[in-house]
Each structure stands twice: as C-alpha cells, then as structure tokens.
C-alpha cells in the first residue's frame, strides 16, 4: 500500500509545504529486502534469571542462524546458551555502542517483583537503539508460567 502523504513530503515541494505548515515529516523505516542480512546491526540480548533455559536456547539458535552481531551484559547468564549455539557474544561495555535490536527473554518472570529485571536491562540502553531499531521481549502466557 502506498503512502501518499509520505511520498508527497519526500518531494522538494512537499518538504517546503510540510515545513511551512508545521506538518510532521515521517521517518523512513528500514525494511527487509531479499539478499540482505535479516539483522543489519548489533543485537543486545538479555535474560531473566531462572532455571528454564529452553526459550534462551531457541533465541540463541535463531541468532546463530541469522549471523547476528551479538552483545550481552557482563552479568547475564545467557552467555552459556549463546556459546552452545555457536554464537560469539561480545561484552556490552556500556560505552557509546548503538544497537539495532534489544532482545530480552522474560520467560522466567513469574511475578511482578521480577519485572525489575526488565527495567535493569532496558533503562541503561533504551537511548542507544538505532533508527528503525526494534525492542523485543519474549515471554510466556500466564497460563504457562
């Protein structure tokens, strides 16, 4: 489906009209194109503490299959699942690194108190998501906890 407004404001006259009227300029989002890597950028992966590692192992296999550049926080125990899947994960040093994807496995969260782990993962890196970046939280339905 075409976006007539988006196409219009991308033209030279459309830019002038939109600017003079104070209209918003839509952001061009990254889209998958055949032949390109599925993830074009770094992925920061985190995991809630807990005994069940099945979801983390699945996530690690998927990241291995798409050849993603993976980072982990130093305190995160998802490193073992990534290593078992053959993913070489780099340490997130907390510098100026930008991430295309923030991915958190929340499948071990079973009560509201454990939601603090989500906060601890995202609050330091939320402003370091690249344009057209993604924030993904993987979890279970309440019936399966």
Language-model segments: which ranges?
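Rossmann-like short-chain dehydrogenase/reductase
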Residues: 2-145
């Amino acid at each position: 489906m075409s976006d007539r407004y988006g196409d219009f404001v991308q033209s030279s006259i459309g830019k002038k009209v939109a600017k003079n009227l104070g209209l918003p300029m839509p952001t061009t989002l990254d889209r998958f194109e055949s032949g390109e890597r599925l993830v074009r950028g770094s992925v920061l992966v985190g995991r809630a503490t807990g005994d069940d590692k099945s979801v983390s192992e699945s996530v690690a296999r998927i990241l291995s299959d798409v050849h993603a550049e993976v980072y982990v926080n130093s305190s995160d125990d998802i490193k073992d699942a990534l290593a078992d899947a053959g993913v070489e994960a780099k340490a997130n040093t907390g510098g100026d690194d930008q991430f295309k994807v923030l991915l958190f496995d929340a499948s071990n969260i079973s009560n509201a108190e454990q939601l603090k782990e989500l906060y601890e993962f995202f609050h330091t890196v939320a402003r370091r998501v690249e344009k057209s970046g993604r924030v993904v939280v993987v979890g279970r339905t309440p019936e399966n906890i």
